[in-house]
Every structure is written in structure tokens, then in C-alpha cells.
């Protein structure tokens, strides 16, 4: 995901002087180096996740669409699915959850044993933090069905294992893992061998078929495998491409935050090894000496809805895992650590150091990001009757007066936009997706600092801002963006590629403009995927531009050829003439020589005196930041979009645009010019 898209929720590191170590404790280093011990730790951690005694009953209620017959049938599950690509899995799920693959109905008791499996427990843990019974039931049902629909079956796993086990002796050895053939460049399988070997419960550098099956059915990896299904799978059969599965496995272990990573990091902080991170352990980890701040961090991490107000906050494994897997934290851990290291201990040490800095920084997602928990709180305010985990139009009408939905027309429009599957109600999954679109991320950002312990206060802010966004933006449906993307996909292969037939002509045969377009929308490469294009053109700035130009005047389901021509003109104008979000990010990265996500004296060894005053000024723009001449990305972005002291009628970015944006044909030239302009101190006098 682009940093520009998540500007308000982006992780920004703050400088913090503390005495805590930047490496994991010695005990954890020993665990990393000893085959099998990591897996033992992971099993121990997951075993601490305690599902409520009535979890199987709540799952049953969530799935039992045809209540009150108290039996979950195949028809119930078919009704439950609105995911088009999961419908094939109904029979597969029933086969997974009970021993009789032909059985087409289940009682609540038949869920009990399966819910104790490691992967199921991990998949369900986040549902504990739902507040109302109806919403918790819906969450349980959705998680268990989604996991059950995607997980590989035993026959597929056996074929996958044999594909990797070259000598067919049912022992996948380190040397065999190291020789795995895959298409990913710069991945040497070392860390794959380390993690798979560590997962072996036999304390040896081989992995048995049983151990392998347990690994590849982890909740966090199964979704990666879904694209490896053949088209036959959608018709009810299972057929997987083993080469694709191999590539996904290599990429997961190399580039993703794995379950073993999460358990190692938890153990690194929970030094008492009692499955409770308490205030003293957090202070030792972060180096924080302020009890008030340390307690506040623990309160934000402690997501249990049942924790009494006067109780001491503690963080269990499920809450820790939920925090690490929140979108922005996950992005940072994977991008800055997992993707940059091919040694497991180096990777864990990197994550350990990064997490320490994240928790210290008051601009970290723990302080600023709308977590899923925030969406749950807001969803439950919207769900006025609190009985079914669904928001109907009547629910919104009930809260209209109290929570500032301005008119009934606003309520109607909100239902049209957020009800993705058009079944006349909004479920949590639809609501969460709607609240994550850039318009809403920006519009509701200021609400996030409201106390999480006062849902009504936070909810009031969210609903009011949501109403404003709904009233003031002309939303464009995803299908419309597909038509715009298709305008550039001249080879009709679901990619925008520089050498595609006819593409250059759409840019008036100007190769420089085409290259800039590809570099911007594709985040650096010269091939643009649909999701990259869609995220780019949904930026808040561009959304305003569409409306200012009267391109979009109502809810749009499909762009016309005339609209696409206007949209293209506006987009190219933005890329060519303005300092874009991508430009700001590239400038920051170019100035950040030591790649520590902050600008300090170390980044300016030859011109510190020229930029010291400017950095001090930038750091002071956001009062919550430490005024120590250390500038993180959020502060830097705020300065770029701040009025110029020399020309108050213009934003700082105007100087960069005048000096660079309109004068250079390539992104590299532009960024080099931005750097030169930044280091010219007279451009931005702060006195």
C-alpha cells in the first residue's frame, strides 16, 4: 500500500532517547537458533488463546440463517456467502468441519472439537473484541467460513509436499528446501529453510508431512494460496498449481509477518513468560520512564471490551497479534524488515527495534489509526437495534437525529454506497471496506484521537464526519474505475505496460509523459496493476479535482468515453504540474540517507548548518512531536502543505512546483531538483 494513501495513518518514527536494547533478549535468540523451539513457542502462545465456552453456539447462531431450526445446513451456508469466489467452497467447508463429507447439516456441538485446532483459534481470536452478541456471532461465522473455504485439503497438501520432497522419502530436508525452484528474484530460500526447520516439532532440520500440513494450514497463509486454484475449483473441485503454491510459500516466509515472527516478538516483550505484557515489561522494552504514557499505550493495546475501567491493563497474545496485524503496522514490519533481511535473527531484531519506536511515537497507528476495533464501535452505534450484526436503513434513521446525519437523503445515499452486495443491509465487512476508502480515511482522521474508552464521543465524531463526506463527495464505484483502467490496458491482459500496443498514442506519443504516468501510478515500476491504479486515482486531491472540473456530478457506475478523456487530462496535469503525494514521499526518502524514517543531522553531513533551522521549524509544526530537530514523514508532509513564510498566500509545495515539477521530464530529474531546492535555505526562511 502506498504511504501517500495512508497519510493520516502512516507510521512515523520519533526520536527517543532510551536505554532499552535494540536486539531481542538472549533467551529469544536461543529459541531462534534452535530447530523446533520456535514452533514449540508458537504452539504455547496459541494455546493461551481461550475461546469462550459458548463460541461454538455463537458460531452456530451466526450461520443458522433459517432460524430457529437450530441446524446449520448446506443451504444456510450458501445463503451466508456473498463472496462470489467462495461459493464453490460450501461443500468443502462442510467436509472440513466434520468427518462425514456427505452430511449436510451440523448441530452446535459438532463445532466444538474443530474450534480447538490451532489455526481455527487464531482465525477467531479477533472476534472476542466485538461488543454486541449479534456482531460477535457474525464475526465468528465469517472468519470460520472464510478460513474453511480457503484452507488446502489434505490431498492438495500431500501433492504439494511431494513436489518439494525431491527424493520422495517423506522427509523435507534443509538441503531440499534450499534448492526449491521459484520465480522470485533475490530470494535464496535461507530464511524459508530456517523457518520450516524451526517449525519441525522433532527438533531437527527436517519437516515431516504432518508438520508441513500444520504449517501450510495456518490462518495467515491460506489466503495467499487462493490464486493458485485452477478455474475448476470454482466448479466445486480442488486443483492447485504446485509451482504457484511454492512461489506463494517462499514469498510468505520471506516477505510476510509470519505466525512464528509474532510469537517470537511477543516472547521478547513478555520477559516473565506468563502471557501478560504488563507495564513494567513495556517500560523495559521501550525505555519509557513515564508511567502515565506507558499505561496509556497498554490501554490502547488492551482491546478487551470486558476490562473494568479501574483494572490494570495487560496485553495477552491475541491482543498483541491483533496490533501487529493491523494494516499500517503490518505494512511497516513487512516492508522495512521482512523484505530486507534473509536471516531470521536479523529480521526479528529489525522488527523488535521497529516496534519499540512505533510504540514510543505518538503519531504511530496505535494513537492515530482507525483500527478495526474503532470500526466495530462505530458499526455498533449504527446498528441501533444491536441484535443481528446488520445495519438497515431504519437503523440509520434512528440515529440520524442524535448523530448528525444531516438529512434522510444522506442516509439513503450512504446505504447506496456502503451496501456493496445490494441486499438492503450493511454487514461489518462491507462497513469496514467502506470506511477504509481514501475519502473516509481522510475525512474521519481527526476523530481517531477521541478516547477509545468513550465510544459515544468517538462515534459522534465519526458519524458527523461520515455524513459530511457522504454529502460533499461524488463517490465513484469501483466498476467505474475499472473502465478507466481498461482505457490504458490496450493489451487486454489486466496490466498497463509501457510497450503495450497503442498505449503511447493515448499520451500524444510523448514517451516522457507516459513514463511519468507509469512511475507515479505504478509506484516506481513501469507496469501498473489494477489495484495500484485504483488506489492512486482515489487520492483525496484527485477526487477534489474531479469535482472541481465538473467531471463527476453524481454517483458514477461507469465512466463514459468523454469522462475518461477529461479524467485523463486532469490526471496528467496533476502528475506534470503539481508536487504529488508520490513526489513528497520520494523527496523524503532521498533526504533520509540512513533509511531510518526520520530526518536528522546524520542525513545532512555536508550542509547541516543550512538546514538545521528549517528542520527545527518543520518539527515544531505538529505540537505533539518532540521538538528536537528530528523530522518524521508526517511532519515533513505537513510542512510541504503549509503556507510559505516568505509567501503566505502560497503553500511550500508551490516553490517546489515552480522550481522543479514543471521543468523536468522524468521522476529522477524531478526528485534531484527537489533535493537541491530543499537544501537552498533562503527558499524557506522561517523567521
Swiss-Prot record:
The keyword Magnesium does not apply. Expressed in salivary glands where expression is strongest in type III cells in the posterior lobe of the principal glands (at protein level). Not expressed in midgut, Malpighian tubules or epidermis. Ca(2+) binds at residues 592, 594, 596, 598, 603. Keywords: Calcium, Metal-binding, Repeat, Secreted, Signal. It is found in: Secreted. Residues 1-19 form the signal peptide. GO terms for cellular component: extracellular region. The keyword Protein biosynthesis does not apply. Residues 152-187, 257-292, 406-441, 476-511, 579-614 form the EF-hand domain. GO terms for molecular function: calcium ion binding. Binds calcium. During feeding of the phloem sap, protein is injected into sieve tubes of rice plants. This process may suppress the sieve-element clogging and facilitate continuous ingestion from sieve tubes. This is Calcium-binding protein SP84. The lineage of its organism: Eukaryota, Metazoa, Ecdysozoa, Arthropoda, Hexapoda.
Amino acid at each position: 500500500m502506498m504511504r501517500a494513501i495512508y497519510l493520516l495513518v502512516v507510521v512515523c518514527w520519533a526520536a527517543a532517547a532510551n536505554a532499552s536494547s535494540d536486539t531481542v533478549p538472549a533467551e529469544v535468540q536461543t529459541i531462534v537458533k534452535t530447530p523446533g523451539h520456535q514452533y514449540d513457542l508458537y504452539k504455547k502462545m496459541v494455546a493461551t488463546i481461550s475461546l469462550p465456552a459458548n463460541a461454538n453456539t455463537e458460531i452456530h447462531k451466526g450461520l443458522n440463517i433459517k432460524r430457529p431450526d437450530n441446524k446449520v445446513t448446506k443451504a444456510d451456508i450458501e445463503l451466508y456467502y456473498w463472496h462470489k469466489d467462495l461459493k464453490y467452497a460450501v461443500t468443502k467447508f462442510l467436509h472440513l468441519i466434520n468427518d462425514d463429507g456427505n452430511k449436510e447439516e451440523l448441530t452446535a456441538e459438532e463445532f466444538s472439537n474443530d474450534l480447538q485446532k490451532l489455526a481455527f483459534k487464531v482465525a477467531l481470536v479477533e472476534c472476542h473484541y466485538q461488543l454486541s452478541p449479534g456482531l460477535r456471532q457474525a464475526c465468528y461465522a465469517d472468519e470460520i467460513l472464510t478460513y474453511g473455504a480457503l484452507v488446502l485439503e489434505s490431498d492438495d497438501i500431500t501433492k504439494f509436499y511431494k513436489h518439494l520432497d525431491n527424493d520422495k522419502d517423506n522427509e523435507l530436508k534443509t538441503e531440499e528446501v534450499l534448492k526449491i525452484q521459484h520465480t522470485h528474484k533475490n530470494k535464496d530460500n535461507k530464511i524459508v529453510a530456517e523457518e520450516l526447520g524451526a517449525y519441525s516439532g522433532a527438533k531437527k532440520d527436517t519437516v515431516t508431512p504432518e508438520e508441513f500440513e500444520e504449517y501450510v494450514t495456518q490462518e495467515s497463509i491460506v489466503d495467499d494460496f487462493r490464486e493458485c486454484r485452477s478455474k475448476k475449483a470454482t466448479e466445486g473441485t480442488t486443483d492447485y498449481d504446485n509451482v504457484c503454491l511454492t512461489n506463494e510459500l517462499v514469498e510468505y516466509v520471506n516477505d510476510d509477518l509470519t505466525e512464528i515472527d509474532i510469537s517470537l516478538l511477543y516472547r521478547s516483550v513478555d520477559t516473565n513468560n506468563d502471557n501478560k505484557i504488563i507495564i513494567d515489561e513495556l517500560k523495559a522494552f521501550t525505555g519509557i520512564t513515564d508511567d502515565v504514557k506507558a499505561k496509556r499505550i497498554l490501554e490502547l493495546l488492551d482491546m478487551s471490551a470486558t476490562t473494568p475501567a479501574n483494572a490494570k491493563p495487560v496485553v495477552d497474545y491475541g491482543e498483541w497479534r491483533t496490533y501487529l496485524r493491523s494494516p499500517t503496522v503490518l505494512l511497516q514490519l513487512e516492508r522495512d524488515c521482512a523484505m530486507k533481511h534473509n536471516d531470521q535473527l536479523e529480521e526479528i531484531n529489525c522488527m523488535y527495534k521497529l516496534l519499540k519506536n512505533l510504540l514510543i511515537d505518538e503519531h504511530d497507528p496505535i494513537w492515530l489509526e482507525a483500527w478495526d476495533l474503532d470500526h466495530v464501535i462505530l458499526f455498533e452505534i449504527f446498528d441501533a437495534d444491536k441484535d443481528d450484526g446488520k445495519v438497515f436503513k431504519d437503523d440509520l434513521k434512528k440515529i440520524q437525529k442524535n448523530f448528525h446525519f444531516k438529512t434522510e437523503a444522506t442516509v439513503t445515499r450512504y446505504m447506496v454506497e456502503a451496501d456493496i452486495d445490494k441486499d438492503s443491509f450493511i454487514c461489518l465487512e462491507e462497513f469496514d471496506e467502506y470506511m477504509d476508502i481514501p475519502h473516509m480515511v481522510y475525512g474521519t482522521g481527526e476523530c481517531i484521537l477521541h478516547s477509545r474508552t468513550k465510544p459515544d464521543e468517538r462515534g459522534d465524531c465519526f458519524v458527523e464526519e461520515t455524513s459530511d463526506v457522504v454529502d460533499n463527495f461524488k463517490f465513484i464505484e469501483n466498476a467505474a474505475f475499472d473502465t478507466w483502467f481498461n482505457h490504458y490496458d490496450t493489451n487486454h491482459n489486466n496490466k498497463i505496460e509501457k510497450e503495450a500496443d497503442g498505449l503511447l498514442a493515448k499520451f500524444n506519443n510523448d514517451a516522457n509523459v507516459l513514463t511519468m504516468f507509469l512511475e507515479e501510478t505504478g509506484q516506481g515500476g513501469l507496469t501498473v496493476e489494477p489495484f495500484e491504479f485504483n488506489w492512486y486515482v482515489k487520492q483525496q486531491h484527485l477526487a477534489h479535482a474531479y469535482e472541481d472540473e465538473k467531471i463527476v456530478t453524481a454517483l458514477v457506475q461507469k465512466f463514459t468515453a468523454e469522462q475518461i478523456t477529461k479524467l485523463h487530462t486532469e490526471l496528467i496535469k496533476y502528475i506534470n504540474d503539481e508536487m504529488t503525494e508520490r513526489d513528497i514521499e520520494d523527496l523524503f526518502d532521498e533526504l533520509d540517507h540512513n533509511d531510518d524514517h526520520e530526518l536528522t543531522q546524520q542525513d545532512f553531513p555536508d550542509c547541516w548548518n543550512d538546514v538545521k533551522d528549517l528542520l527545527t521549524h518543520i518539527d515544531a509544526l505538529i505540537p505533539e512531536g518532540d521538538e528536537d530537530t528530528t523530522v518524521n514523514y508526517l511532519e515533513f508532509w505537513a510542512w510541504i502543505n503549509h503556507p510559505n513564510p516568505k509567501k503566505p498566500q502560497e503553500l511550500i509545495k508551490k516553490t517546489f512546483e515552480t522550481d522543479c515539477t514543471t521543468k523536468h521530464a522524468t521522476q529522477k530529474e524531478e526528485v534531484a531538483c527537489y533535493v537541491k531546492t530543499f537544501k537552498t535555505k533562503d527558499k524557506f526562511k522561517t523567521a
